[in-house]
Amino acid sequence: MTRKLRLGVIGAGLKAAEYAESWVKMPEIEFAALADTTAVSRQRLIDVCLAAGTPEPKGFEDYRQMLAECRGELDIVYVSTPHAFHAEQATAVAEAGLDLFLEKPMVTTVAEAERLIAAQKKSGVTIVTAFQGGLSPLVLDTRRRALAGEFGALIAISGMIWESWSSNYDGHWKQQPDISGGGFMFDTGAHMMNTVCLLANSDFDSVSAYMNNHGRQVDIATAVSARLKNGALATLTAAGEGPPGCASYITFFYSKAIVRIDAWGGWREISVGRTAEPREEAEILGNPMKNFLAIREGKMENSGSVEMGLRFARLWDAIKESAAADGASVRIVAQ
């Protein structure tokens, strides 16, 4: 009988508790340890495990203590904490030699991404960033077909995403810049940026951006005009206030086809020539742990790799720099 993979959790908030409801039923894994600075959050996740009839995981207030004491008792770690903590915690997990499933976004800056990549290369562990779009069958199929040349050359990209985010997260840590790493563009908008980075299969070359905080401490609206290193042009628009709801449209204009898809990979429309194929829909993944395990076993492409995270970080750093300079063009130098 195959031994279960021993899972450690860093950040036992609502997202982790939500996922735990399904993960605790998986025969492949068991919750072995968890760390959170809040006792209520730790107990909530422990209660999920106990309610499922599984052993109680060890609880820690400090993730560093968990890694120090349980390093030999863990196989994989899931990190779900405010964005600004990702880099330090992810790097510590990699240095401990443990495979990592990391909530999006991977890190907040290029410098953090480079440090994490160095730790990953030294230890050889698997690191996957949990973007729904990156794990979506429709997004991955689109990537495969684009790379195979089915759609022709990429000409341009138009991406839009919106949500009643400003009011939805009023007072939330996501609107505290010291721990969020950014506003709407870096939170919900991150899904759009990541799907664009993944499907464009190219780093960005130059970026011009504007942001409007609309009275908040973080960006609520963002407009980006950019050129990619493969020659394609792109516009990205993020509106973090409006009527209730959340949606996205991204259009990829190729020389042989037009592909429309949402940031999470929930639907796709493809037009080839004068023929428009019916809209395809796919369930946005409710249990991404299964995909993480498939990637870990080499059965699935790692679309959430540290290298993809670096591409994303380069774009985000350039957007921030340009917006701070009132839209001045910023050139991205990718090593």
Where are these regions (language model features)?
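Short amphipathic alpha-helix with an adjacent loop that forms part of the alpha/beta core around
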Residues: 63-73
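N-terminal Rossmann-like dinucleotide-binding module
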Residues: 1-52
